[in-house]
């Protein structure tokens, strides 16, 4: 089976050098995902030759950087002969348009002795006897002919890809991954922008927490463009014991700050250039603007919050689409360690608590469990 793959539109807008780099990364990601067949680039698209099965279609639909793709039939060389194209179109499309209202869409790259309109008209005339009629505005079925120099491609399906950028073109980001509904969606959104996530999980729920985090990451792995996901699991219980020394109402913000500090160390270790969280403005007490300011104060890496303007319904909708919702919904809210958390914590208080607690963030990270998925 031959598949034509159309990269995301924004890739085409890059400089020639960047475009080559992005298309090269996309091709490598596809190779990693499909693991068989042959792939090559040509005039702004990619071609993939694989065994004829639906598994490849499903896998391609989760590769970031792909706008759409189509399984195609082709004439290798037709010597600029429109009659050859018409005959092949009848062979490929006669059953597809049978008893249906149809339209023909054609486009060309290269020099030919006919126009795209000629192709549409002549092929339409040839297919008309098999059909129930033609309607260019609202057809029941569309058939496509794409002529690239001396090769013509025939297809009737355009399968949507996830768009975005190929995973790997934007470097690494450390993701604070609780395993709730939000953090897997934030991870997915950063992968969509080309970033490789390094996962940092504070385990506050033992084996159950660990189990569901691993299941969520196995789902996200299908969207990673073949890149392995590295997971660092920190023993969060030890951190909670430390936090019991400070005022209850400050503990949630302080816990988040500890997470940021450990993430900062992991950025150093993993050569990541940012920290990503699933925080959404004012969704919970620790995510008010004041508390977010306090939480990230003094952190040297930029903090990305891809969900900052999303409401919960929008996040849930994305989680369902990604496939992580069914696992996230089973997890308790482990970070809710105080019933009377403050919506406006004073920075001076938190910095004083931090000094008194004197947590060794390097040691916390060193004692983490590392899993590659």
From Swiss-Prot:
A Gene Ontology molecular function term for this protein is: ATP binding
State a GO cellular component annotated for this protein. Answer: cytosol
Q: Which reaction does it catalyse?
A: [ThiI sulfur-carrier protein]-S-sulfanyl-L-cysteine + a uridine in tRNA + 2 reduced [2Fe-2S]-[ferredoxin] + ATP + H(+) = [ThiI sulfur-carrier protein]-L-cysteine + a 4-thiouridine in tRNA + 2 oxidized [2Fe-2S]-[ferredoxin] + AMP + diphosphate; [ThiS sulfur-carrier protein]-C-terminal Gly-Gly-AMP + S-sulfanyl-L-cysteinyl-[cysteine desulfurase] + AH2 = [ThiS sulfur-carrier protein]-C-terminal-Gly-aminoethanethioate + L-cysteinyl-[cysteine desulfurase] + A + AMP + 2 H(+)
Listed InterPro entries: Rossmann-like_a/b/a_fold (IPR014729), ThiI_AANH (IPR020536), ThiI_fer (IPR054173), ThiI_N (IPR049961), THUMP_dom (IPR004114), THUMP_ThiI (IPR049962), tRNA_STrfase (IPR003720), tRNA_sulfurtransferase_ThiI (IPR050102)
Q: Which CDD domains match?
A: PPase_ThiI, THUMP_ThiI
> What are the binding positions for ATP in this chain?
176-177, 201-202, 256, 278, 287
Q: Name one GO biological process term.
A: tRNA 4-thiouridine biosynthesis
Q: What is its EC number?
A: 2.8.1.4
Which stretches make up the THUMP domain?
54-158
What are the entry keywords? Answer: ATP-binding, Cytoplasm, Nucleotide-binding, RNA-binding, Thiamine biosynthesis, Transferase, tRNA-binding
Its localization reads: Cytoplasm
Q: Which Pfam families match?
A: ThiI, ThiI_fer, THUMP
Q: In which pathway does it act?
A: Cofactor biosynthesis; thiamine diphosphate biosynthesis
What exactly does this protein do? Catalyzes the ATP-dependent transfer of a sulfur to tRNA to produce 4-thiouridine in position 8 of tRNAs, which functions as a near-UV photosensor. Also catalyzes the transfer of sulfur to the sulfur carrier protein ThiS, forming ThiS-thiocarboxylate. This is a step in the synthesis of thiazole, in the thiamine biosynthesis pathway. The sulfur is donated as persulfide by IscS.
The similarity comment for this entry is: Belongs to the ThiI family.
Entry-linked NCBIfam families: tRNA uracil 4-sulfurtransferase ThiI
- Tell me the protein's name: Probable tRNA sulfurtransferase
Q: Which organism is it from?
A: Saccharolobus islandicus (strain M.16.4 / Kamchatka #3) (Sulfolobus islandicus)
